[in-house]
Amino acid sequence: DVGKKAVANDIEGSKKLWGALVYAVKDAASKRDGYEDADAEMAKALQQVFKDYKHFQVLGTRAEALFKTTHSWVAPSKQLCVKFDFAGLTEDGIGVKLDLQLWNQGKAIVKTDAILKPGSPVFMEGPEWGNGLLLYVLKLQDGKDDKEPLD
């Protein structure tokens, strides 16, 4: 769509999609060595959605510029990653509409449409792993902002 491409070109590089692969477990004994705990803000937000889980570790993060191709990947892991396609701006121009796919070992396991706005992350539930669950956190990030919190 020509209109979509024009809008994308106008704001190319001004926004990024930031993603984190998170390991969620119910007890501290199940945590993995060598990984950082999610910061308090992220852990609190995740615990509100995934109520059975008490501990969250960040396994990897990645930020990818929006609008640079017809589709892009946010891939902190070779096995679990998110493919996203730009589907336009929200009516207020603040957020973006995305077609999201969560991929596990080369297969799409979740497909959804999402609207991302600053301060409103999206959480995607992935497969069970070890004694816990893999989660994917996505947030819209200003292109100049390299911070990772959920603000």
Feature names for model-found ranges:
Residues 1-151:
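Outer membrane pore-forming secretion/assembly proteins and partners of Gram-negative envelopes
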